[in-house]
Amino acid sequence: IIIYYFTIIAKASDGKEVWNISKKVGMMTAGVIGIITVAGAVLSPYIIRIVYGSRYEDATALSTVFWIVYALNAGIRMVPMNFLPAIGVAKFNAIMAAISCGLHLIITYFAISQFGIWGAGIATGFVYVVSGVVYWVYYRKKCLYD
């Protein structure tokens, strides 16, 4: 979805139009990712059993957490992160990548010490949601006010 709309966004000159298209793409992407995530979470026990064997069935819950975490990334962050370069703003992505990486490292360290392996999922999900909100706020500002 994002790849198809990238060129449309890049060619559009009206910021309000870009914003409106982007909101629709964001909702479509979140919907598709939501469906895939539910399917992945439901099928995780079978996937793990088929691919790794019954010996690893205890990883099913953790697998489900990571389906959700990566859905947060794809459903919240990916649209503005990919559309910013389409409107000529790429530096922000580099800055956000560095900040997200540092924040992720710090939060993961403390989350794992508190929650064990589950802390990795919690920290990753937290960073994805927070950075995703920052991306959308900045993207909106660039579309509507610059």
What are these regions (language model features)?
Residues 19-29, 63, 82-106, 118-121, ...:
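Alpha-helical transmembrane segments of multi-pass membrane transporters/permeases
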Residues 1-15, 80-86:
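Helix-loop junctions and terminal segments of transmembrane helices
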Residues 42-71:
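Interfacial segments at transmembrane-helix termini and the short loops linking adjacent helices
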Residues 8, 33-38, 67-74, 97-101, ...:
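Residue-level hotspots within the lipid-embedded alpha helices of multi-pass solute transporters
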Residues 13, 51, 87-89, 115:
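Membrane-helix interface residues
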Residues 44-49, 99-133:
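Membrane-interface helix-loop junctions in multi-pass transport and translocation proteins
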Residues 128-144:
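Multi-pass alpha-helical transporter architecture, strongest
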